[in-house]
Amino acid sequence: MSDFYWLTIIVVLPISAGSLIALLPHRGNKVVRWYTICICLFELLLTTYVFCYHFKLDDPLIQLEEDFNWINLFDFHWRLGIDGLSIGPILLTGFITTLATSAAWPVTRNSRLFHFLMLAMYSGQIGSFSSRDLLLFFIMWELELIPVYLLLSMWGGKKRLYSATKFILYTAGGSIFLLMGVLGMGLYGSNEPTLNFETLANQSYPVALEIIFYFGFLIAYAVKSPIIPLHTWLPDTHGEAHYSTCMLLAGILLKMGAYGLVRVNMELLPHAHSIFSPWLMIVGTIQIIYAALTSPGQRNLKKRIAYSSVSHMGFIIIGISSITDAGLNGAILQIISHGFIGAALFFLAGTSYDRIRLRYLNEMGGIAILMPRIFTMFSSFSMASLALPGMSGFVAEFVIFLGIITSPKYLVMSKILITFVMAIGMILTPIYSLSMSRQMFYGYRLFNVPKSHFVDSGPREIFIFMCILLPIIGIGIYPDFVLSLSVDKVETILSNYFHG
């Protein structure tokens, strides 16, 4: 038990502070915006302080643990704790949410509700990453869906209600399987039901039952990640949502699925994971190729970026299913890396839409001369997306490759085949990424429009751009900055596979 309730404060602060937005004076939207940004900044600084001064990097066990008995009837605890696996996603959540609130500056309609929902989503995400009780994890997982649904249905494009309904149907459908898995694991085996992660990690199940539990969790995480064929909500949702919501979806929401896959499926159900991992490897490989081939056919700019997200998530799935130190560390690095890159691409797609009011790539062209700063930013992040050496995506994909090649679980022939198919996927990525830049920025299509309409990016947008670009280059040059957080925890997780 920690001496002070740091994690409870970090989880509860955003939603509590967000509920006070209703009490702010009605003096336009500026007060609400600054209040929300200050709360996000304070939360990020508090989280960073706690991790710098109260977290020991060389200890793979759970730290800063908090445990309050919440409901006596069935041993339900408010149980929080962090380790090397959850630090990266929590800091990423704070960083991207802070930037997304400053990206939401142009939102004027119902801005109080909009900013409250962003803060509520922040609490749900941090709660999911830091919960050490399976039912609390489920509650936080669900808490985060309600703000997303409202953000999608109230702010966005013409088809926003359709895409929001599709999102909630998919994710709520997946959550049913998650709840069944949570209750099944909690009620199995012991006289008293227990939902504590530590107790469940030492619990053994009959193989058939473990496979059923694993499959239930896998469906929930496959919807969220997304893993094909449960990915079809993602392009629609991204195509219609406001770009600050897209930043949160691409930067954090998709990473919750991958985090759950490691935290629950790998840690608590190791035997089932070693049975399922070859199939996950195949699905991940197909996903990279499928998304890379589907992306060039998308006319909508944001849908094309969404398919690139699906392709990048394929690398994470392959890293998780390689069951090696390098593979899993690479997957965690890719989670952080794509969190930055995905958020940045959606932010730039949104800012360019604000200026030219065009969604479809075949209507665009010639923006580079009119808006050189946006062109420079977009080109930089396109390079990061296609894993240019010196940027975080390259290191993550390289480490995942290393994980597959060194994996003792797979035969040499299957490793060569998977690596070959992944390499094809990496060759296809520049094709859709660079063709997107070409269609947007080159040509003469927009030259006959009066140029007075177009304003290049201002200081706020350049600041957000630099805030995302610096970590991408920093991690690309010195990946140990992220890997040092997770390396001990990864060894602990994998010890179940080789000694269990």
Curated annotation (Swiss-Prot):
Q: Which Pfam families match?
A: Proton_antipo_M
Which locations, inside or outside the cell, does it occupy?
Plastid, Chloroplast thylakoid membrane
State the membrane topology. Multi-pass membrane protein
User: Does the UniProt entry include the keyword Cytoplasm?
Assistant: no
Q: Which GO terms describe its biological process?
A: ATP synthesis coupled electron transport; electron transport coupled proton transport
NCBIfam families reported for this sequence = NDH_I_M
For this chain, one GO molecular function annotation is: ubiquinone binding
Q: Which family does it belong to?
A: Belongs to the complex I subunit 4 family.
The record's catalysed reaction(s) read:
a plastoquinone + NADH + (n+1) H(+)(in) = a plastoquinol + NAD(+) + n H(+)(out); a plastoquinone + NADPH + (n+1) H(+)(in) = a plastoquinol + NADP(+) + n H(+)(out)
This protein's UniProt keywords: Chloroplast, Membrane, NAD, NADP, Plastid, Plastoquinone, Quinone, Thylakoid, Translocase, Transmembrane, Transmembrane helix
Cellular component GO terms held in the UniProt record: chloroplast thylakoid membrane
Protein's name in the database: NAD(P)H-quinone oxidoreductase chain 4, chloroplastic
**Segments traversing the membrane:** 4-24, 35-55, 80-100, 113-130, 134-154, 167-187, 208-228, 242-262, 274-294, 305-325, 330-350, 364-384, 386-406, 416-436, 462-482
Q: What is its EC number?
A: 7.1.1.-
